[in-house]
Amino acid sequence: IYELIEDAVFVAHNVKFDANLLAESLFWEGYDLLSPRVDTVELAQVFFPTYEKYGLSSICKSLEIPLEQAHTAISDAKATALLFLKIQEKIQSLPKSLLERLLDLSDNLIYESRLVLEDCLSQMSQENTRDLLDCHGIYLRKKRKIAKEKHLSADFTKNLSLLGLEERSEQEKFATMVEQAVENHHPSFLQAQAGLGKTYGYLLPLLAKTKEKIVVSVPTKILQEQIVSGEGKAIEAVFQVSCHSLKSPHSYIKLDTFYQSLTRMDDHRLLNRCKMQLLVWLTETETGDLEEIRQAYRYQAYFEELAHDGQISKKSLFYGYDFWQLNQEKARASRVLVTNHAYLLTRLEDDKSLIEGKTLVVDEAQRLFLTLDNFSQKSIRVTQLLQEIQQEISQSTSLLNRRLLESIQFELSQAVEQFHRGSQREIKEDLIQKLRQDLSELPAHYLQELRELLDQKYEQFWLEDDHFEQNRVTSLHGARLSLVNFQDFLPEKVRLFFISATLEISRKVSLAQLLGFQNYRFYHLPPKDYHQQKIWVDKDFPDLIGLPLTQHAQLIVERIERLFHTKLPILVLFTSKDLLLEVSERLSLPHLAQYFSPARGLFLPSAVACSSYVV
C-alpha cells in the first residue's frame, strides 16, 4: 500500500478520517504517510454550493454518480473517484481569473486540497466567461430576457395536457369552481380537500380568464419556494408566464458588503472557505437569494452581515447588478408573484399598492388568521437586548448616547428583577413612555428591535418566561389590544380568492367573518368519500388544559398498549417534541421514535428498538 501511494496524491471523501486511519496503520509498520491529501467533501461544498447534504450517498445522488453498495470500500472509492472528476470538470468550467481569486483563498481548504485548484489552473489556456459578467472581480450571470407570454386555453384540461399532466376529476371540479368565482365581484372563499392539486387548479383558470397580475400568498417560505420551483417553473417553461418569489430584502445578498468582506482575511478558516463558496454560487444564481445556500446556518453571523438592507446607492459599484434592485424589477415585470402570509401583511401595512388592481389568492387561508394574530404582537429576548445595549455602551464615543443607553439598561433590568420577584408582570405606561423618550434621543440606528417593539401600534406590554431544559429565557412582549382586521390591509380595487380545506370553523362562525368580511361568496367542493376509512374519537380522554406532561404521556402509553393487541401497524403523531420523548421513555413496547431537527435538516432518533408495529 505504501508503494502504491508513495508518489501519489491521497484523495478521499472526508480525508481526515481515512488518512488518519491509514497513517496509524502504516506507522505501526515503520512507515510515515507523507502523501499530499485532498478532501472531496470540502471541494464539493465549495464548487457545488447549493446542495443540502454532502455525505457521499447524498452528493452521488445529486450528481447522478453510481454508488451501488454504499459504505463498502471499493464502491465508495469508485464513487469518490468519479466525484473528484466531476469537481475538476466544474472547476475548469469557471472563468480563469475567478479561479485565480479562489486560489488566493484556497489555503483555507483542509490539508493540500488547494493542489486541485493549482492543477486545474495550469491546464486552462483562456478565459471561460460563458454567460457571465465580470463585475469588479465578482462574476455574475447575465440578465435573462423575459419571453413574451403565451395565451392559455380557456379549456383547463387542455392546459393540463400541454403541461404533460394527467386529468383528475376532483381537480377539474375545483378549477370549474374557480372559473365560476371569477365571474362575481365579491371576495370568494373556496373550500376543497387537501391533495387534489389546488395550485394548478386556481393558477391555470386565473391565468386564462383574467388579465391582471396574480399575487399568491402561502403560509410558509418553504411552500413559497415549492410553488415557484414547481408549478411556477412548469407554467413558465410552457406558457412563458413569468413567476417570481417576493421576499424581504434581508433574503438577498448585498454585493457591496460581500465585496468589502473579500478585502479582509478572517481568522475563521471556515468563514474564508464560505467566501469561496459564495464566489462560485454567484456564477450560478439568478436571484441572489441566500436561502439557496442550504447550509447557511453554519455561517449565521456572516450571512446576517451580508443580508441586504433594502438600500442601494447610485454610487455603488454594483448599481444595476444589485440583487434586491433586480428582484424588484422582475417583480414589476412578472405576471405571477408568490409570497408568504407574514411578508404580505408586512408589505400591505405600509404599501397597499402591492396588490392594488391585481388578483390576490390566499392559499391555506386558515393560516392567515394565525399570522394576523402573530402580526398583532411582537417579542424580544431581554438577555440578548441587554447584551446589545452593553456592547453599544462600550463602543459609543458620545457621552450623551452612553447615558441614554445606561438609562434604558437600568429601567429594563429593574423591570426584569421585579418580574422575577413576582411583583410585576405588566410593564406600566410611564416606563414605556420613558423608554420611548430615551430611544427618540438616540441616533436612529441604535436598538432597532426595541424601537419596533415600542412602536405606537402596540398598546400593551408585559414580561414572560420560557423554561427550557438548561435555562430560563425572559422576553418582553408588545401587543395590540384589538385583533387586526384583514380588510384594513386591502386597497379598494383588488380581486380576492381565499382557498383552504378548512374554511368552515363551526355552524356559527366562518373564516370569512373572522377575517372581517360580511359580503362574500362561499364555494364548497364536497370531500371525496373514502369507504375504507374510519375515525374513532376517544371520549374518555381528559381535557388537555392543565394536564401535566407526565400524566398526558402515561395516558397515551396506555392507549398504545391497548391498540397494540390489534396487531396492526401504529403511527403516533405528536405536536410536541417533549411529549414524544416522554412517551418514548415510558413505552416498553419495541418502537422507533423520531423527531425533525430544522437546524440539521434531518430526522433524529430518540429511541430505536425496531418493530413493524409501533412507530
Question: What name fits each language-model region?
Answer:
Residues 225, 229, 317-336, 341-438, ...:
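Signature of the SF2 helicase/ATPase Hel1-core->accessory helical subdomain module
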